[in-house]
Regions:
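Extracytoplasmic/secreted proteins, especially bacterial periplasmic and envelope-associated proteins
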Residues: 10-13, 42-45, 49, 53, ...
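Generic structural signal for hydrophobic
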Residues: 15-18, 77, 109, 136
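His/Asp/Glu-enriched short active-site or ligand-binding loop at hydrolase and phosphoryl-transfer sites
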Residues: 71, 76-109, 141-152
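Accessory recognition modules or surfaces
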Residues: 1-11, 21, 95, 102-119, ...
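Structural recognition of the beta-strand scaffold that forms the well-ordered cores
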Residues: 1-3, 24-29, 63-67, 83-88, ...
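Active-site beta->alpha N-cap acidic-glycine motif
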Residues: 1-56, 60-61, 151
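C-terminal domain-boundary segment and adjacent tail
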Residues: 8-9, 124-175
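Acidic-and-aromatic substrate-binding clefts and catalytic sites of carbohydrate-active enzymes
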Residues: 2-11, 34-39, 66-72, 92-97, ...
Length: 175
């Protein structure tokens, strides 16, 4: 789960639960701000703020981030130092789409190593995630955390590098 840093402490119980259930917990920026409109110094301060919150809740930091709006070039230019996890399948759930529409649009997109983008801001997303996970299992896919996905192929996530997917050690990246 990529979580907005400033929301971690107010929702510490959810952060702890996600971690306890084996999910990866990582950064989705401190404020969900547009990195193109934030100073480089402020961007570089985000990892410490996010990691302080994570350490106070689950005892461990993160080393990666999903940049709001996908504007990772600003983060790389500022040399923030995280690995950036983007996505290869976008559900557009944030638009309020129904589960059936999301499934019909995404089913044909899935391939091994994909990273799926979903949000927690819409009431329908948990149900969509459940339906999607069940369908993916039926198709023979295995769901992995980001760490598991890259570790299975021996890929080390590098700072200031963007990752979109990983399959058999082949990553789609940008530096």
């Amino acid at each position: 789960f990529f979580m907005i840093g400033k929301n971690m402490k107010p929702y510490a119980d959810l952060v702890q639960r996600a971690h306890d259930e084996g999910h990866a917990v990582a950064s989705h920026n401190w404020t969900h701000g547009d990195a193109r409109k934030i100073s480089a110094a402020t961007l570089r301060a985000m990892p410490e703020k996010v990691n302080n919150a994570l350490i106070s809740i689950i005892g461990i930091p993160t080393r990666y981030d999903r940049v709001p709006y996908g504007v990772y070039p600003a983060m790389i230019k500022a040399k923030v130092g995280w690995a950036y996890i983007q996505w290869s399948v976008d559900t557009y759930d944030w638009r309020g789409r129904s589960t059936s529409l999301i499934m019909s649009k995404t089913k044909k997109q899935f391939t091994d190593g994909d990273i799926v983008l979903m949000h927690d801001i819409k009431d329908n997303t948990p149900n969509t995630a459940k339906v999607m996970a069940e369908w993916l299992y039926e198709q023979g896919y295995i769901l992995l955390t980001v760490d598991e996905l890259f570790a299975k192929d021996g890929v080390t996530l590098e700072p200031d590098t963007v990752y979109f997917r990983c399959d058999d050690g082949v990553t789609t990246i940008k530096k």
